[in-house]
Swiss-Prot record, chain A:
Biased composition (Basic and acidic residues): 608-620, 828-839
Protein name: Enhancer of polycomb-like protein 1
Region of interest called Disordered, as start-end residue ranges on this chain: 350-379, 393-415, 608-640, 679-839
Biased composition (Gly residues): 697-713
Keyword tags: Cell cycle, DNA damage, DNA repair, Nucleus, Transcription, Transcription regulation
InterPro entries in UniProt: Enhancer_polycomb, Enhancer_polycomb-like_N
Intrachain disulfide bonds: none
Main location (coarse class): nucleus
Curated annotation (Swiss-Prot), chain B:
InterPro entries, A to Z: Acyl_CoA_acyltransferase (IPR016181), Chromo-like_dom_sf (IPR016197), HAT_MYST-type (IPR002717), MYST_HAT (IPR050603), Tudor-knot (IPR025995), WH-like_DNA-bd_sf (IPR036388), Zf-MYST (IPR040706)
Region: Disordered, residue numbers: 1-26, 98-163
Catalytic activity: L-lysyl-[histone] + acetyl-CoA = N(6)-acetyl-L-lysyl-[histone] + CoA + H(+); L-lysyl-[protein] + acetyl-CoA = N(6)-acetyl-L-lysyl-[protein] + CoA + H(+); 2-hydroxyisobutanoyl-CoA + L-lysyl-[protein] = N(6)-(2-hydroxyisobutanoyl)-L-lysyl-[protein] + CoA + H(+); (2E)-butenoyl-CoA + L-lysyl-[protein] = N(6)-(2E)-butenoyl-L-lysyl-[protein] + CoA + H(+)
Its biological purpose: Catalytic component of the NuA4 histone acetyltransferase (HAT) complex which is involved in epigenetic transcriptional activation of selected genes principally by acetylation of nucleosomal histones H4, H3, H2B, H2A and H2A variant H2A.Z. Acetylates histone H4 to form H4K5ac, H4K8ac, H4K12ac and H4K16ac, histone H3 to form H3K14ac, and histone H2A to form H2AK4ac and H2AK7ac. The NuA4 complex is involved in the DNA damage response and is required for chromosome segregation. The NuA4 complex plays a direct role in repair of DNA double-strand breaks (DSBs) through homologous recombination.
Positions marked as site (Important for catalytic activity): C327
Enzyme class, first EC level, given as a word: transferase
Protein name (record): Histone acetyltransferase ESA1
Assembly behavior: Component of the NuA4 histone acetyltransferase complex.
Zn finger region (C2HC MYST-type): 218-243
Length: 839, 469
């Protein structure tokens, strides 16, 4: 072997020693490769055989291996067999022991019977027993003898497993017989023993299993045993003693209690448990599984027990019923016999208990068709209605407590005698109680909030007190700007509860606050503008009237642009109402400047009406129902959105406010300078006024349109930018078309004069009061607006479109007796922008 | 036969002398003056065997009917040829070799000469083993094998370093049914068995009840494999027993044979009987542990009396080492009829059905080795010749035949088919191989027809594979 290894090593430089099983190898016949160099081939070497080393060198094996190797190298060698001991003899008695009765089944054999099951009695008598049997009188059959011997052996191994230690202690026949009888009886009576089950099966199915003992066989054996047991016992005892207590039939040596590995006759030891690597997890899992199984078994057991109990109870109930019936029968005959006449109530089976459930069932039945989709009209009857209500309340197939699951039939006697409520009823009651509680809560809330206004919608803007103080101290009626800011100012003045800024205000307004009525119904818009053109709000007394209160809201107006025939543009507005306030008188005043002599004929009225058809932008009838009823709700906006909106508004407005004040101061300084200049100019202008053209270039507006108020506003340099927004929008809102219609150049001149005067007044005022409040500016604007004027759109008006509701309000609050109008299509662009703002 | 003996004269006296030359250390003390009744167990004497003079070791000394008898083991013969000889066959004139003095109290231990030889060899062998382990790390990877050192499982153990406790521990955990021959009684304990209509001489020791060893012949039932020392008992038993076939499921049936699958756990008695019987003919089989972890595949021949057992192989329900056969035996009366090949073929058919490769558990017996080698060679040659493939990997061959790649390589090497040609390994179908194939075609051997196999690989739960009570 060492030589071979060396040889392999020497040729290693020529050839690969290792081979991969995944390497593809060419399969070639030797005849195809004559150039195969034999020298390079491996020297034939010893290959491991898998045979034990000692045996590998055995003579015959080596001979055989060498012969096969020789064969493989082409040598002609006879095949060598390893000699084995003789096995060629035939047993002549074979046929005597094996009968020819086997029939091959067509299908493959499948069986699980064991050797013991097919071998009959496990004791086989030997020659010694045969000798003994010959001497027996009366003769005993071999089968009986074996049976008895087997029973002796089995019994002794059960009762005296260690009899081999001392054979003299062997059980006596009497003891043995007793044990055997007990054993047989026990087996027969034990319903879990396989013998018992087998016997049962055999008797019930009429089959017999070969080589097994049934019940009868046990009895038969007992009879035989009584007959021959005593005869056989001495023989058995002798053999047992001879065997020193070992079983008479020799058996294999199994492992004893002390381990004896050296005894070659000990075989078939029990293998120790293969050490399975255990993890706790599997333990836990299996324990869990076992527990669950146990629980399930318990449940099943309980169920079965309960079913059994129920059935017993039912049986008892039936029995009782039967007894009652029998008793009644007896009473009936008795009554008849004795001639007792009376009420037979006690003889009639009372089914009272069954009545109620039946009614309920009827109700249920009635409810089903209704639920099935029939018109509610069919539910005219009270019962049906109730059923429907019940059905509606439950929302699901109403299962009343009287409903019995179909597969469980409860005897009528078991149904409790009480008023039963449907689930539907219960659910309905519950729902109602909840609704009621909610309503009550809401009512209480409304009560608590009655004196309070939710103004979060129009934003509370805290602003500096000094601005406001001037107004309040001046006693001048505030000019409402109809912005949210104005609102605030108004409320601050008249309802101190909304103002927290200063103590002084609080003290001052305390009295009025106490006297104040809450304005719960401040929803009327139309009331803002009085017929006389005065602002109601300016009247201090009107504050007590809730109707007059103006709480401007967002206009619920929406617009739509569309292109009509011929490319005409249309602006549709929604949310407008007919202007009911429109009066012929005012119309006349307004429109008949040029044609004063003509009478108001119907056509004109119609035209006017038509023209004014869409003039009102806001809905007077629109109810701010959410406002007064539930302050917590604003415009249907969620409270979250509101708080965000409100918060951002507060911030932006506060900043704006501050900036405005700052700017105002600067502007006022500038204005003072300008004023001086203006006064000088005015004097000059007065001198030349007669020859001045109407379109003043200073107005910075289209000359044909005669920019009046707008020009004034812009020329005035917008006294208060904060208030300029609404004002300018007001200008925007004023349709241009009216300028031509309603103004003559002369009027325009007059207007300009008046405007200038107004400006002067205003400037004087401003001079007088250094702290210019928005109110002030507003009042100036209002004063201007009080004059009949036609304003054109001011370019800077749009700058302030961002103020909420400003634009929409502007129209409504114009302090002009003549309502301002918008002409459809007149100022399309600006309106659409307004619409955007509103949206 | 003659040629083989001429080639291998080691068993003869002359040969032995050369053997001692090789290993000069143990001086064999030949005592020329020994009386016949002085011989005792362990002595080596010259015995006349089949007209030849052979050295035999005395394994037991008995007095029978007043005559002195020796039970002897012929050196370099398989144990199955051990026999009881009359004192007259011992040739005392050539002297007696006394057992090793250091082991006088161990009469049943290995032969003195053998063991000393082994000891001399051991160091070099071990050296080689460790060397190969160190220099061929590729041996660890699964698909690369060192052609110079193809290891076969189960044969690396040194018989002299055999540790009893280790061996038993291996048996305990490994589920193997083989055991070192050093640990079982070396004396055959039964004289003759009557099995069916055959009278057979047992080969080896088997732990039948010790009472039966006193009988001249024991009777073994052909169907239940139950054993009886008394003919009367056997007769009674045969009159009652109704079993006519192995007590399991028939999983294969063709015109000649049937195969039955029997679970050792379910048919304990039958399987124990089978093991006792097969132990008579298998040296390395152990009955140390019980039959539970094995399935027994039994081949039977049918006739009008029933299914007669021809051979069987056992198979671990779960083999950690990938063995597809634990023990395999064709009963002696059926040997040399091709049944062994059929058994092997069937074991590979099962492996194919399982989709695994498999190999028989080692060590193999001499007969086992020859049978397997013949089967492997025929299978591979047939595959290569029939398919006419131009190229194949070892793995391909393994997967088609369900043989392990080691066995494939082993076989190719044994038949000198693995050659090195133009810098590459090739499988060379040598002329002798082609010749062999021609012969095979003529022979028309029996084969397992896989279509007749009605079998699904049995699946066992962990609980079923535990071997405790």
């Amino acid at each position: 072997m060492a030589k071979a290894a060396k040889a392999a090593g020497s040729s290693a430089r020529f050839r690969q020693r290792k081979i991969s099983v995944k390497q593809t190898l060419a399969v070639l016949k030797q005849s195809d490769i004559p150039d195969l160099e034999e020298e390079q081939q491996r020297e034939l070497q010893q290959i491991e055989t898998g045979v034990e080393k000692g045996e590998e060198e055995e003579h015959h094996l080596q001979a055989a291996i060498n012969s096969s190797i020789a064969q493989s190298t082409g040598a002609k060698v006879e095949k060598i067999y390893i000699p084995t001991p003789d096995a060629s003899q035939v047993w002549k008695e074979y046929d005597r022991f094996y009968s020819s009765s086997f029939h091959e089944p067509a299908s493959y054999i499948r069986t699980s019977v064991t050797v013991e099951e097919t071998s009959g009695c496990l004791y086989n008598m030997d020659d010694e027993d045969a000798e003994f049997l010959k001497t027996c009188k009366p003769p005993i059959s071999e089968d009986d003898f074996e049976e008895v011997m087997h029973r002796f052996e089995v019994t002794i191994s059960e009762k005296q497993p260690f009899v081999s230690i001392d054979v003299s202690n062997l059980l006596s026949f009497e003891e043995m017989a007793q044990h055997i009888e007990d054993g047989i009886r026990q087996v027969q009576e034990d319903p879990t023993s396989p013998e018992y089950i087998l016997a049962q099966l055999q008797s019930s199915l009429g089959i017999t299993v070969n080589g097994t003992k049934g019940k009868n066989e046990g009895k038969a054996f007992l009879a035989t045993f009584k007959k021959i047991g005593a005869v056989i016992y001495p023989h058995w005892r002798a053999r047992k003693v001879e065997r020193k207590g070992q079983s008479i039939v020799p058996h294999l040596k199994f492992e004893d209690h002390e381990k004896d590995d050296s005894d070659p006759y000990v075989c078939f030891r029990r293998r120790e448990l293969r050490q399975v690597r255990k993890t706790r997890r599997t333990d836990v899992l299996s324990i869990e599984r076992l527990r669950r199984m146990q629980a399930e078994m318990e449940t099943a057991k309980q169920l079965v027990e309960m079913v059994a109990t129920r059935e017993f109870t039912r049986k008892a109930a039936l029995k009782a019923e039967w007894d009652v019936f029998e008793d009644r029968c007896a009473i009936k005959t008795l009554k008849r016999e004795l001639g007792i006449k009376g009420e037979d109530e006690d003889l009639v089976a009372q089914k009272k208990r069954k009545v109620e459930p039946k009614k309920e069932e009827k109700a249920e039945k009635a409810s089903t068709p209704v639920r099935g989709g029939k018109a509610a009209g069919s539910a005219a009857s009270a019962q049906a209605a109730a059923a429907q209500a019940a059905a509606a309340g439950s929302g699901s197939p109403s299962v009343s407590s009287t409903h019995v699951p179909p597969n469980v039939s409860i005897p009528p006697s078991k149904i409790p005698n009480m008023d039963l409520i449907t689930i539907a009823q219960v659910v309905r009651d519950k729902d109602e109680a909840i609704a009621k509680a909610v309503r009550e809560k809401l009512r209480l809330r409304a009560d608590a909030d009655r004196d309070w206004h939710n103004l979060t919608n129009s934003g509370y803007i805290p602003y500096c007190e000094y601005l406001n103080a001037e107004v309040s101290s001046s006693g001048e009626p505030p000019v409402p700007q109809y912005s949210s800011i104005n609102e605030m100012a108004y409320f601050e003045k008249h309802n101190a509860s909304h103002r927290y800024t200063t103590k002084s205000d609080f003290n001052k307004d305390l009295a009025s606050m106490v006297g104040n009525k809450p304005f719960a119904d401040a929803q009327v818009y139309g009331a803002i503008v009085g017929d006389d053109g005065e602002l109601r709000l300016s009247d201090a007394t009107s504050t007590s009237s809730p109707v007059d209160r103006v709480i401007p809201r967002s206009s619920f107006m929406s617009m739509r642009k569309r292109v009509g025939r011929g490319g005409r543009m249309w602006m549709d507005r929604r949310g407008l109402q007919r202007n009911t306030v429109l009066k012929p008188s005012s119309l006349a005043k307004n429109s008949l400047d040029d044609t004063a002599e003509s009478e108001a004929d119907e056509v004109a009225m119609e035209r006017l009406a038509d023209r004014q058809k869409y003039d009102r932008e806001t809905e007077p009838t629109r109810q701010m129902s959410s406002y007064d009823k539930d302050p917590s709700q604003l415009n249907g906006i969620s409270s979250d959105t509101q708080s965000i909106r409100f918060g951002s508004m507060l911030l932006s407005k506060a900043y704006e406010n501050y900036r405005e004040v700052f700017q105002q101061r600067q502007q006022q300084l500038m204005m003072l300078q300008q004023q001086i200049l203006q006064q000088q100019q005015q004097q000059q202008m007065r001198n030349r006024q007669q020859s001045h053209p109407p379109g003043d270039p200073g107005a910075g507006l289209g000359g044909g349109q005669g920019a009046g108020g707008g020009a004034g506003g812009s020329r005035n340099n917008s006294p208060a930018p904060g208030t300029n927004g609404p004002q300018s929008k007001m200008h925007n809102a004023a349709p241009m078309g009216y300028n031509k219609q309603g103004m003559t150049p002369s009027q325009h001149q007059q207007y300009q004069q008046m405007q200038q005067q107004q400006q002067q007044q205003q400037q004087q005022q401003q001079q007088r009061k250094m702290g210019v409040a928005p109110m002030n500016a507003a009042s100036a604007a209002a004063a201007m607006a009080a004059q009949p004027r036609r304003s054109s759109g001011s370019p800077d008006g749009q700058r302030f479109n961002g103020l909420p509701n400003g634009g929409a309000m502007a129209n409504g609050v114009l302090p002009n007796g003549m309502s301002q109008r918008m002409m459809p299509g007149g100022d399309m662009k600006q309106k659409s922008e307004l619409a955007k703002v509103d949206a | 036969m003659a040629l083989a003996e001429a080639d291998l004269p080691n068993g003869k006296t002359n040969g032995k002398a050369s053997g001692s030359e090789e290993t000069p250390a143990p001086v064999q003390k030949v005592d020329m003056n020994v009386a016949i009744n002085e011989l005792r167990v362990g002595c080596k004497v010259h015995v006349e065997k089949d007209g030849e003079d052979r050295v035999a070791e005395i394994l037991s000394v008995q007095m029978r009917r007043g005559n002195l008898e020796f039970y002897v083991h012929y050196v370099e013969f398989n144990k199955r040829l051990d026999e009881r000889i009359a004192a007259t066959r011992v040739d005392l004139s050539q002297g007696v070799i006394w057992p090793e003095p250091e082991k006088p109290k161990k009469p049943l231990s290995g032969a003195a000469k053998e063991s000393s030889k082994e000891k001399k060899k051991n160091p070099s062998k071990k050296q080689k083993l460790t060397d190969s382990a160190a220099t061929t790390p590729g041996a660890n990877s699964e698909d690369v094998m060192d052609l110079d050192n193809l290891q076969v499982n189960g044969t690396t153990q040194d018989p002299d370093n055999f540790n009893r406790d280790e061996e038993i521990e291996k048996l305990r955990t490994g589920g193997s049914m083989t055991q070192s021959s050093h640990e079982v009684a070396r004396v055959r304990n039964l004289q003759r068995i009557v099995l069916g209509n055959h009278v057979i001489e047992p080969w080896y020791f088997s732990p039948y009840p010790i009472e039966l060893t006193e009988e001249d012949e024991i009777y073994i039932c052909d169907f239940t494999l139950c054993y009886f020392g008394s003919k009367k008992q056997f007769e009674r038993f045969r009159s009652k027993s109704t079993l006519r076939h192995p007590p399991g499921n028939e999983i294969y049936r063709d015109e000649a044979v049937s195969f039955f699958e029997i679970d050792g756990r379910k048919q304990r008695t039958w399987c124990r009987n089978l093991c006792l019987l097969s132990k008579l003919f298998l040296d390395h089989k152990t009955l140390y542990y019980d039959v539970d972890p094995f399935l027994f595949y039994c081949m039977t021949r049918r006739d009008e009396k029933g299914h007669h057992l021809v051979g069987y192989f056992s198979k671990e329900k779960e083999s950690a080492e990938g063995y597809n056969v634990a023990c395999i035996l064709t009963l002696p009366q059926y040997q040399r009829h091709g049944y062994g090949r059929l058994l092997i073929d069937f074991s590979y058919a099962l492996s194919k059905a399982e989709g695994k490769t498999g190999s028989p558990e080692k060590p193999l017996s001499d007969l086992g080795l020859l049978s397997y080698r013949a089967y492997w060679a025929d299978t591979i040659i047939e595959l290569l010749m029939e398919k006419g493939k131009q190229e194949m990997t070892i793995e391909d061959i393994a997967s088609v035949t369900a043989m392990t790649t080691t066995d494939v390589l082993h076989t190719l090497q044994t038949y000198n088919m693995l050659k090195y040609y133009k810098g590459q390994h090739i499988i060379c179908l040598t002329d002798s191989v082609c010749e062999k194939y021609e012969k095979m075609l003529k022979k028309r051997r029996r084969k397992v027809n896989s279509e007749l196999l009605k079998w699904k690989p049995p699946v066992f739960t962990a609980a079923q594979l535990r071997f405790a009570w």
